[in-house]
Amino acid sequence: GTLNLGMGKQKGDAIAPSGKTVTITSRKMDADPVLITKLFERGKHKIGYLMYTNFTKTFNTSIVKAFNEFKEAGITDLVLDLRYNHGGDDDASTFLCSAIVPKEKAVVGTLLSKETWNSPCQKIFESDPQYENLLNRFFVETNCNLDLPSQKVYILTSGETVSASEYTIACLKAFMDVELVGTKTYGKYVTM
């Protein structure tokens, strides 16, 4: 929408109308969650650094661009900064995992994760004919799998590492070596 604001000037303890009006129009803005990408070299290691602030599948193309640049540079190691990532879309998390887990393990269509709920909820899910798709996540095609030689990822964490970030950490731990650097995550998932 549009909003017209009447401007004023401070006169003592009050604000007096200046007669000027400013019109502002709202606009939806989506910030790219790939906030920073950098390359570092330490000895024989070429390190790709990615600060990722929110899991938003509309920006998977930003992951593709960053990871293809990392691949072109020949990175040996990845530092994934999730310190200020409050989570987001599970599909974006699945995409990111599919791009990081080594190729021989990240086979498109194979199981990435399986959710298990308490007994009453689990029974409700399992009564749905599509429950496999409700509780399970599968590797997807990314066209940017890093296939890191070390099969290890370093993840920077903080108390603001929440939800889909923690889910991503848990999924990556199941398929490769993950070294957490930082403080305890928020604790919505079991990766604390």
What are these regions (language model features)?
Residues 8, 51-55, 81-85, 111-115, ...:
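Active-site-proximal beta-strand/loop segments in catalytic clefts of secreted hydrolases
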Residues 31, 45, 56, 144, ...:
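Residue-level recognition of alpha-helix boundary/capping or hinge positions
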Residues 1-78, 84-86, 91-92, 98-105:
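Flexible, low-complexity junctional segments that flank or bridge functional domains
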